[in-house]
Amino acid sequence: FDVICVMRERTRFDEDLLRQLPTLKLLVTGGMRNAALDLKAAAALGIQVCGTDSYKHAAPELTWALIMAATRNLVVEANALRAGKWQQGLGGDLHGKTLGILGLGSIGQRVARFGQVFGMRVIAWSENLTAERAAEVDVTYVSKQELCAQADVLSVHLVLSERSRGMVDAQA
């Protein structure tokens, strides 16, 4: 192959695999970051790697579905229905609660909008976020400690790296 388009982030292209593709000139990935690609090996082998503008709706939609499922006890309720029981409980409300967002980039901003639509107070923190930038999307900037202390729901939207690994722990 001269060109390969990688559609899944989990498809590994390590040095061994890249060496088995001697005619490969271009490796295209959905999104701008793909940890499964060995960029150093690709460069050493003369393979150009580039990304596309990612589809930014899937992650926020899945995030919101998981928040709703956890808050409303969806799995327990679905299992009760399957067992012939009806509505064991309503779960908790989101309206009036605080949504904390760690990482207010494009995905975090979309999740913030979902929270706002549901009547949640939305707060955020990340290392490069400013109060002014947060205010542009009607979000309140807080410290990391305030974020963890005040959030009823904490949603993390950071690239996993050495800098972000372990950022949320028991001390947070």
Task: Give the positions of each predicted feature.
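N-terminal glycine-/charge-rich "phosphate-binding" loop or analogous flexible N-terminal tail
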Residues: F1-R8, G119, E132
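Phosphate/diphosphate ligand-binding glycine-rich loop within oxidoreductases
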Residues: V3-A78, G92
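Alpha-helix boundary recognition
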Residues: L18-P22, A43, R82, H95, ...
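Residue-level detector of alpha-helix initiation sites
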Residues: R33-A36, S54, K85, T98, ...
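Residue-level detector of flexible, active-site-proximal loop/helix-junction positions
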Residues: N34, K56, L81, L129, ...
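A short, charged, Gly/Pro-tolerant segment at domain boundaries
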Residues: A80-Q88
